[in-house]
């Protein structure tokens, strides 16, 4: 999609008009500052673009030249896209070396209403409830607290999500 057409459509008629207007203005600024043409600025139907699906306002705040060619090109340079995503995650609170999530097994009789990324408990509390790692390794107590995440529902795999997982959700709210 043409980024300007996508964002203008959403700014005119959509549930998030104010958001789309901000993104459209940021896209116009990006076009001017980066020396791009509208035909170069392709996006999803919602205006996200490049290898890592940045939004124009995120580009303005977090995009970097990861390959040293003097440009911030998230469409064609994986190095620029990944370095920019790393900057965005770092600025959003990513803790280097801390886990994002680990797979866990839940005990029989687990109260599934506790499985919600907003319901956090100290790792020691989850352990006391019988939550453990399937591989026999210890739960990462250094992570402090975690939440049980069931991306495929109660019959699918279970994960314990930590602060870095919530940081990823700031980047992209789709947890599936």
Region roles according to the model:
Residues 38, 45-49, 55-156, 162-165:
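Flexible, glycine-rich surface segments
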Residues 1, 13-24, 48, 52, ...:
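Solvent-exposed, acidic/flexible segments
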Residues 1, 27-32, 85-86:
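Short, functionally critical alpha-helical segments immediately adjacent to catalytic or ligand/cofactor-binding
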Residues 14-17, 34-38, 92-96, 133, ...:
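Short secondary-structure junctions and interdomain/linker hinges
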Residues 3-7, 115-117:
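Short, surface-exposed, charged loop/turn segments at secondary-structure junctions
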Residues 10-11, 31, 62, 89-92, ...:
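Generic structural signal for hydrophobic core residues of well-folded globular domains
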Residues 8-10, 87, 166-170, 176:
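Short, hydrophobic/amphipathic alpha-helical patches that form generic packing surfaces
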Residues 5-31, 65-67:
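Acidic, His- and aromatic-enriched active-site or binding-groove loops in soluble protein domains
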């Amino acid at each position: 999609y043409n980024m300007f057409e996508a964002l203008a459509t959403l700014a005119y008629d959509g549930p998030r008009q104010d958001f789309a207007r901000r993104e459209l203005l940021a896209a116009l600024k990006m076009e001017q500052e980066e020396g791009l043409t509208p035909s170069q600025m392709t996006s999803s139907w919602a205006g996200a673009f490049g290898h890592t699906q940045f939004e124009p306002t995120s580009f303005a705040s977090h995009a970097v030249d990861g390959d040293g060619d003097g440009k911030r090109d998230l469409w064609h340079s994986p190095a620029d896209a990944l370095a920019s995503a790393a900057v965005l995650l770092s600025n959003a609170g990513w803790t280097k070396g801390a886990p994002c999530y680990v797979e866990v097994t839940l005990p029989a009789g687990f109260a599934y209403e506790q499985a919600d990324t907003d319901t956090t408990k100290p790792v020691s509390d989850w352990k006391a409830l019988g939550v453990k790692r399937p591989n026999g390794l210890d739960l990462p107590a250094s992570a402090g607290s975690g939440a049980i995440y069931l991306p495929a529902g109660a019959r699918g795999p279970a994960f314990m999500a930590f602060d870095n997982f919530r940081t990823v959700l700031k980047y992209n709210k789709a947890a599936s």
